[in-house]
């Protein structure tokens, strides 16, 4: 590009947990010599999933009811994670981390359990988990077609066109509040899904929508039904059913059932 940005598209490769090196060399236009080289080590080939939403997607594994057991088990699965900063800042300043006892506490609890479930069923496929979620946010902030799209521009667009396998979405509590017109969610959720897919340009990748569980918030039943109708209308949208879980806490303390 004129501003110096560039991109390389790699041919499809089979999934592999074999550590590899990516070597990037820059040529000096005056001498013709390759004088600037960057080496990225421990590169693996697998699936990358993006987790979006508000506080329940953002809440870290350290706060889960089964945190100790989950964290001690974190290194047993080939998971890597990337947390987008919650202030809409410079996404590029964030780095990938390897899931382990010393790092897993910072992972999204829902996304950890989702990734662990995938890893257990696809042991030969490395799993990368990107989480971009902000507490107390309405859906209109996550899609320009649904409203302001401010967080979409700040925390989702910079990730494009990062190759994704799919998206997990856990959001809707804010839109069920009494001061909100919850009926808009019937249009906002499918438009968000369509906008993300269109802007990524990778086809109709899967969306896994976490169903709003039992909780004492005004119009939660409307948001829950909007999630269901969106799921029924799109063969590439699936629902993670949670209505059968005990309790009515807006922040369920045990996240494993919400991630599988």
Annotate each language-model stretch with its function.
Residues 1-260:
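Cell-envelope and extracellular/periplasmic
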